[in-house]
Amino acid sequence: MSHTVKIYDTCIGCTQCVRACPTDVLEMVPWDGCKASQIASAPRTEDCVGCKRCESACPTDFLSVRVYLGSETTRSMGLAY
């Protein structure tokens, strides 16, 4: 079952989600939108097991990284209108 990993622009570049991921789905990439000059990226979503450890590790008030399990709809991802 495939899962979708979405990174929001509230990411502060702390790397907590990257370090928490047991399957190395996430990595940091350069980004000028935050003080750390980097943002999480999810280039290997096919390896996501849906454990949501990245979500648990995120220190921001609004989770900057979210895992949408294969059974969740596009509406829950905010893509439907």
UniProtKB/Swiss-Prot annotation:
It is found in: Plastid, Chloroplast thylakoid membrane. It is an enzyme of class 1 (oxidoreductase). It catalyses: reduced [plastocyanin] + hnu + oxidized [2Fe-2S]-[ferredoxin] = oxidized [plastocyanin] + reduced [2Fe-2S]-[ferredoxin]. Its main location: plastid. Its cofactor is [4Fe-4S] cluster. One of its GO terms (biological process) is photosynthetic electron transport in photosystem I. [4Fe-4S] cluster 2 binds at residues 21, 48, 51, 54. It comes from the Eukaryota. [4Fe-4S] cluster 1 binds at residues 11, 14, 17, 58. It is a peripheral membrane protein. GO terms for cellular component: chloroplast thylakoid membrane; photosystem I. Keywords: 4Fe-4S, Chloroplast, Electron transport, Iron, Iron-sulfur, Membrane, Metal-binding, Oxidoreductase, Photosynthesis, Photosystem I, Plastid, Repeat, Thylakoid, Transport. Apoprotein for the two 4Fe-4S centers FA and FB of photosystem I (PSI); essential for photochemical activity. FB is the terminal electron acceptor of PSI, donating electrons to ferredoxin. The C-terminus interacts with PsaA/B/D and helps assemble the protein into the PSI complex. Required for binding of PsaD and PsaE to PSI. PSI is a plastocyanin/cytochrome c6-ferredoxin oxidoreductase, converting photonic excitation into a charge separation, which transfers an electron from the donor P700 chlorophyll pair to the spectroscopically characterized acceptors A0, A1, FX, FA and FB in turn. The eukaryotic PSI reaction center is composed of at least 11 subunits. HAMAP family: PSI_PsaC. This is Photosystem I iron-sulfur center. The gene is psaC.
